[in-house]
């Protein structure tokens, strides 16, 4: 059950003179690798479930123009953002590329939108979730994470065997000097309200916050701890839940699938990694491809055909390279 939530006043100070609400989904893209396929799949998935709202792609400057054109051709709103870096540190991130994910903080500066739903590029939406935009303001909504995979081996929860997904199985030891940690969300999907005040506070807080293994996810959990409200896991099924906590999963009811487990990215899937030969995983990968390959879900441009560029979407998609990521050095936050 969610704890008592105290409302963060910085959310409320800008509400008095707002224009009519404007809503959008938003995702993040960096580099010239194949994650663009994930964003294309997400855009088509949102169309399939008849979402009423656009998909904004917050992208770093190193995303090539050919990938930007792919996304424009799929009806995405392309927004370039500058990178955000944590303070200088020697921390070892759970994944090397996580340092780039601090740049997600820029989406709080998209003040033309009153509310947004963030979705990672390796997520697919299989049922309409537009109703989440109607959740009460002034809170941060996301799905609780699972601590059972080896990527959490650095954590106290993992060493104890404690997981918030089933706290009754392994309870928090009574002899621990500290109480159980606060509820912790997965930052691959969340509902939030852009705000210049929140944005500035995020950047200022980052400057004095030591980085940690899960990068911006740890940081956001710390920053929004007092206003976090958990939502059901149907809104962000982390695939490890299928083998770690199957009793908590009703797969037929899941609306949002997060292909974050090692080897589960549909556009790279081989079935060779651990747990990837499961029938439920194969089914979910096939579902993603069904959406991605469905040409009826391609964006129908309102621009006359003779005004469109001569480069076709199919020729651009065919040029997407194998995975490659441009990494930035990590200077102090700015």
From Swiss-Prot:
Subcellular location: Cytoplasm
One cellular-component annotation, GO: cytoplasm
Location (main, coarse): cytoplasm
MF-aspect GO terms: inositol 3-alpha-galactosyltransferase activity; metal ion binding
Protein family per UniProt: Belongs to the glycosyltransferase 8 family. Galactosyltransferase subfamily.
Record: active site: 104
Recorded catalytic activity of this chain's protein: myo-inositol + UDP-alpha-D-galactose = alpha-D-galactosyl-(1->3)-1D-myo-inositol + UDP + H(+)
InterPro entries according to UniProt: Glyco_trans_8, GNT1/Glycosyltrans_8, Nucleotide-diphossugar_trans
Alphabetically ordered keywords of this record: Carbohydrate metabolism, Cytoplasm, Galactose metabolism, Glycosyltransferase, Manganese, Metal-binding, Transferase
CDD domains on file: GT8_Glycogenin
EC top class named in words: transferase
Upregulating conditions: By methylviologen (MV), a superoxide radical generating drug.
Keyword match Glycosyltransferase: yes
Name the record gives this protein: Galactinol synthase 4
Cofactor(s), by name: a divalent metal cation
GO terms under biological process: galactose metabolic process; response to oxidative stress
Lineage per the UniProt record: Eukaryota, Viridiplantae, Streptophyta, Embryophyta, Tracheophyta
Signal peptide: none
EC number: 2.4.1.123
General function of this protein: Galactinol synthase involved in the biosynthesis of raffinose family oligosaccharides (RFOs) that function as osmoprotectants. May promote plant stress tolerance.
Pfam families on file: Glyco_transf_8
Residues that, per the record, bind Mn(2+): 120, 122, 258
């Amino acid at each position: 059950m969610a704890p008592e939530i105290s409302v963060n006043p910085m959310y409320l100070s800008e509400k008095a003179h707002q224009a009519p609400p404007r809503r959008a989904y938003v995702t993040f893209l960096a580099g010239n690798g194949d994650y663009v396929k994930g964003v294309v799949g997400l855009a088509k998935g949102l169309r399939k479930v008849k979402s009423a709202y656009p998909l904004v792609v917050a992208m770093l400057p190193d995303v090539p123009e050919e990938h930007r054109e792919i996304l424009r051709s799929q009806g995405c709103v392309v927004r370039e953002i500058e990178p955000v870096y944590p303070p200088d540190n020697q921390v070892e991130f759970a994944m090397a590329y996580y340092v780039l994910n601090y740049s997600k903080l820029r989406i709080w500066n998209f003040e033309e939108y009153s509310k947004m739903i963030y979705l990672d590029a390796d997520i697919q939406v299989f049922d309409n979730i537009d109703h989440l935009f109607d959740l009460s303001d002034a809170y941060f909504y996301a799905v609780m994470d699972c601590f059972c995979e080896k990527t959490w081996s650095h954590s106290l929860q993992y060493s104890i065997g404690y997981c918030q997904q089933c706290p009754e199985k392994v309870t928090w030891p009574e002899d621990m000097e500290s109480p159980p940690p606060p509820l912790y969300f997965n930052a691959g999907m969340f509902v939030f309200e852009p705000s210049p005040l929140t944005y500035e506070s995020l950047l200022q807080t980052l400057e004095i916050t030591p980085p940690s293994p899960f990068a911006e996810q740890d940081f956001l959990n710390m920053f929004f701890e007092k206003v976090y409200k958990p939502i059901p896991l149907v809104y962000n099924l982390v695939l490890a839940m299928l083998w770690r906590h199957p009793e908590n999963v009703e797969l037929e009811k899941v609306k949002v699938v997060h292909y974050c487990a090692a080897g589960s990215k549909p556009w790279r899937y081989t079935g060779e990694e651990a747990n990837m030969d499961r029938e439920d995983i194969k089914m979910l990968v096939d579902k993603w491809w069904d959406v991605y390959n469905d040409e009826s879900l391609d964006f129908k441009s309102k621009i006359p055909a003779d005004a469109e560029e001569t480069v076709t979407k199919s020729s651009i998609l065919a040029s997407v390279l194998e995975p490659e990521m441009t990494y930035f050095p990590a200077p102090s936050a700015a």
